């Protein structure tokens, strides 16, 4: 007997970026192969007129709730927003990642992965003097030890390239992170370098930063507005950024409240320069606080900027699954995959979206969470669904 039948829904084929009206069967926590004859399932969910997706993936947010001032609660920011898989964006380094793993990661309802911060203490608070980015203090020996201990959970190394962290170090922290990553990749670990790009100091340029990135590495906050941005004075995309994307560097919107503007999103959509990934970059002080407070809200803002629904949904399903190296367990709805499922309503809207600078955009599509299923179990459901 099947456990669950989700019927009549428009199922998102994330690899193709298309919808298909079909039923989904779930058995023992996995998506099941339909048979010609079958017994009536225990639970039937009628998704007529709704959209059935792989559980959404929030590839960059901060979830060290018990050990960091910036850590959000994964159970309140993920599950109600149809997020079944999340990756912590480097909140912790070698000195405190085990605490984060034991206190939060293994306890959250969603499947949580993490980037390891190259700074030993990670990013524990929002203050003037932030994490230590002296490359001499990065401790590659301890980083390697943690990758051996948590090979399935750790998905890369995080380094913040911004005025607040770099001081006079210039490109040295990124160069050291790339060396550590290369050694771990040689040992068979999935270990891209994830760069927080924002308000670069004068001794680091967009050209230098993007030229250093390798295929599979990730640049977060690509639509940020401080200092040198990805846009040249004439509004075109910086050639180094364009070339990085073409050679396989992964570009992450990494939304947050402060790392984007409506004009930047509109300019990117107009130039067909969408990100590979959209993530929420939620931190504790931004949980459900406007101008943007969740992954679904970020999708709605991008829709208001003119992006197509199908491409946006790939940015929160198959694309981050590939970037994290977990496409064998997330981001796709097919038999044998875990039954991590999102059901949404995608409604027309006249809602006006605002950024932190006061810019506005009239809404297009609103992404409304109806049901979240993790491992075949309903973890969240709207009262009217």
Regions of interest found by a model, annotated:
Residues 9, 338-385:
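C-terminal cap of metal-dependent C-N hydrolases
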């Amino acid at each position: 007997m099947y456990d669950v039948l989700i019927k009549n829904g428009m199922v998102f084929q994330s690899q193709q970026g298309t919808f298909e009206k079909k039923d989904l069967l779930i058995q023992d926590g996995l998506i099941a192969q339909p048979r010609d004859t079958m017994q009536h399932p225990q639970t039937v969910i009628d998704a007529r007129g709704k959209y059935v997706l792989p559980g959404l993936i929030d590839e960059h947010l901060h979830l060290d709730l018990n050990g960091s001032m910036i850590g959000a609660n994964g159970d309140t920011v993920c599950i109600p927003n149809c997020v079944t898989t999340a990756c912590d964006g480097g909140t912790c380094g070698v000195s405190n990642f085990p605490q984060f793993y034991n206190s939060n990661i293994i306890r959250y309802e969603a499947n949580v992965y993490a980037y390891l911060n190259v700074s030993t203490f990670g990013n524990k608070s929002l203050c003037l003097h932030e994490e230590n980015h002296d490359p001499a203090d990065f401790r590659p020996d301890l980083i390697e030890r943690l990758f051996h201990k948590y090979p399935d959970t750790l998905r890369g190394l995080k380094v913040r390239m911004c005025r607040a962290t770099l001081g006079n170090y210039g490109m040295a922290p990124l160069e050291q992170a790339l060396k550590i990553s290369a050694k771990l990749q040689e040992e068979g670990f999935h270990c891209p370098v994830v760069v927080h790009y924002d308000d670069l100091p004068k001794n680091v340029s967009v050209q230098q930063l993007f030229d250093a990135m390798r295929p599979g590495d990730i640049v977060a906050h690509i639509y940020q507005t401080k200092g040198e941005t990805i846009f040249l004075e004439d509004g075109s995309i910086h050639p180094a950024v364009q070339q990085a994307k073409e050679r396989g560097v992964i570009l992450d919107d990494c939304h947050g409240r402060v790392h984007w503007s409506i004009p930047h999103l509109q300019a990117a959509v107009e130039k067909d320069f969408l990100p590979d990934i959209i993530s929420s970059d939620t931190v504790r002080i931004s949980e459900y606080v406007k101008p943007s407070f969740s992954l679904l809200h970020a999708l709605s803002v991008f829709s208001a900027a003119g992006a197509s629904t199908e491409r946006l949904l790939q940015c929160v399903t198959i694309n981050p699954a590939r970037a994290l190296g977990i496409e064998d367990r997330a981001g796709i709805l097919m038999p044998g995959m875990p039954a991590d499922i999102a059901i949404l309503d995608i409604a027309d809207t006249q809602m006006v979206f605002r950024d932190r600078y006061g810019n506005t955009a009239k809404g297009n599509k609103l992404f409304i969470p109806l049901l979240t299923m993790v491992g075949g179990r309903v973890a969240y459901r709207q009262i009217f669904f």
